[in-house]
């Protein structure tokens, strides 16, 4: 049961990390240097 809970939390935090990274990368006013990495 503990392994299941750990795996669930890992997936949740993984998607949250991707969502936050994508949000910051798509915000030129907050991170203008991200444009160079997207190309």
UniProtKB/Swiss-Prot annotation:
Top-level taxon: Bacteria
- How does this protein sit in the membrane? Single-pass membrane protein
Task: State the organism named in the record.
Answer: Synechococcus sp. (strain RCC307)
**What are the transmembrane regions?**
6-26
Q: How does it assemble?
A: PSII is composed of 1 copy each of membrane proteins PsbA, PsbB, PsbC, PsbD, PsbE, PsbF, PsbH, PsbI, PsbJ, PsbK, PsbL, PsbM, PsbT, PsbX, PsbY, PsbZ, Psb30/Ycf12, peripheral proteins PsbO, CyanoQ (PsbQ), PsbU, PsbV and a large number of cofactors. It forms dimeric complexes.
The entry's localization annotation reads: Cellular thylakoid membrane
Chief localisation class:
membrane
Query: What Pfam families has UniProt attached to this entry?
Result: PsbI
Protein's name in the database: Photosystem II reaction center protein I
At the highest ranks, the source species' classification is: Bacteria, Bacillati, Cyanobacteriota, Cyanophyceae, Synechococcales
Q: Which family does it belong to?
A: Belongs to the PsbI family.
Q: Name one GO biological process term.
A: photosynthesis
| GO CC list | photosystem II reaction center; plasma membrane-derived thylakoid membrane
Q: Which gene encodes it?
A: psbI
**Primary role:** One of the components of the core complex of photosystem II (PSII), required for its stability and/or assembly. PSII is a light-driven water:plastoquinone oxidoreductase that uses light energy to abstract electrons from H(2)O, generating O(2) and a proton gradient subsequently used for ATP formation. It consists of a core antenna complex that captures photons, and an electron transfer chain that converts photonic excitation into a charge separation.
Record's keyword terms, sorted: Membrane, Photosynthesis, Photosystem II, Reaction center, Thylakoid, Transmembrane, Transmembrane helix
Q: Which InterPro entries match?
A: PSII_PsbI, PSII_PsbI_sf
């Amino acid at each position: 049961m503990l392994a299941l809970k750990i795996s669930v939390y890992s997936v949740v935090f993984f998607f949250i990390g991707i969502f936050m990274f994508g949000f910051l990368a798509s915000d030129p006013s907050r991170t203008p240097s991200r444009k160079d990495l997207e190309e």
